Regions:
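Nucleic-acid-interacting cores, centered on viral/eukaryotic replication and modification enzymes
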Residues: 1-333
Length: 333
């Protein structure tokens, strides 16, 4: 809403306020805390703008927002990837955690999905409060010749884009018609939230619309440009709650990672060079690659066995909270 000058001034003010937070993050001594503020506070701030503005009006803001989020992440990683590696790492960082990314959702990609969802969520409310005006909007949206108002033309274009990218595969069937939305069609209740992640809009249609866009981008734009090893890594770190550790609050030793270890984990997820000291594996003597593939797979070094300890400690804490007496490292006789 508003003139082009008003929109530009408003979005520039938003960018300036966002930058005030982004400037502080690289100065923090705790990388895990800085990451949480970037992922859960700075990145989602774009959602209000991309829901309220048509994609063409939100484009300049979304591009600037995404660029500043990526620049801040590079500062936290103390590394600036270039060329194809940089493009792929940036693409991976914007994917939801369940699709193998870091969850720093790209506002440009979210914009059409969010704008369509805002209208999908609002049509019934408009009908209840302003039925005459709502009927005019519905007729305009259903017109085969295209809507008269630019905002309605843009939401029609967003709906067509979602259809082309496979909305029917998002888990709720075909995209609802404008009349169905007008009459109050709602997505199924998210009782099982294993598929959703912190920061996702789960109260309406945006989750399914955004999921359509993210899945299409992953399968048709990002993965075809990856090597076989990179695709395998991306798939192995995908799935419900596969990235839950990224949003763990460091309130106990079990959920806390040192800055060096946390940076290694972030780089590994983006397939960027790791902070390694040895040139050869201490187990089998093979040369170590800078992406950590050998270290993650070598069965001779004993590192695979060490993965069990954190899981044991987590279950020990659960049992202890339930009142059980838990003993660690008990010898089996």
């Amino acid at each position: 809403m508003g003139t082009a000058d008003f929109i530009q001034a408003h979005t520039q003010d938003r960018i300036n306020k966002e930058q005030a937070l982004l400037d502080w993050l690289p100065k923090m001594g705790d990388l895990q805390c800085a990451w949480l503020l970037l992922a859960l506070c700075a990145t989602p701030r774009a959602n209000h703008v991309v829901r309220a503005l048509p994609p063409t009006h939100a484009r300049a803001y979304a591009e600037e927002h995404d660029s500043r989020i990526w620049n801040t992440l590079q500062q936290l990683l103390c590394y600036t990837p270039t060329g194809g590696r940089g493009r792929r790492a940036r693409g991976r960082s914007t994917l939801p955690g369940r699709l193998g990314g870091l969850g720093l959702r790209e506002a440009q990609r979210t914009s059409p999905a969010a704008y369509w969802a805002s209208w999908a969520d609002a049509l019934e409310v408009i009908r209840q409060r302003r039925p005459n005006e709502a009927a005019v909007l519905l007729a305009d949206l259903e017109s085969t010749e295209g809507a008269r108002a630019q905002c309605l033309r843009e939401v029609q274009a967003a709906a067509d884009l979602l259809d082309r990218e496979g909305f029917e595969q998002a888990g709720v069937g075909a995209r609802p018609s404008w009349r169905q939305l007008f009459e109050g069609a709602r997505p199924p209740a998210q009782e099982d939230r294993r598929e959703t992640e912190p920061g996702e809009w789960i109260h309406g249609w945006q989750f399914y619309a955004s999921s359509t866009r993210e899945t299409f981008y992953r399968e048709h734009h990002l993965m075809p440009a990856m090597s076989r090893a990179a695709r395998a890594t991306l798939r192995s770190q995908s799935g419900p709650q596969a990235a839950a550790w990224l949003t763990a609050v460091p309130t106990s030793p079990a959920t806390t990672l040192s800055p060096v270890l946390f940076q290694i984990c972030l780089r590994r997820r983006l397939r960027l060079p790791l902070l390694l000291s040895n040139r050869r594996c201490e187990g089998c003597g093979a040369p170590l690659d800078d992406l950590g593939d050998h270290r993650a797979a070598c069965s001779v070094s004993g590192r695979l066995r060490r993965r069990a300890k954190p899981i044991e400690l987590a279950w020990s804490a659960v049992f202890a909270e339930a009142g059980a007496v838990v003993a660690d490292q008990v010898l089996l006789r």
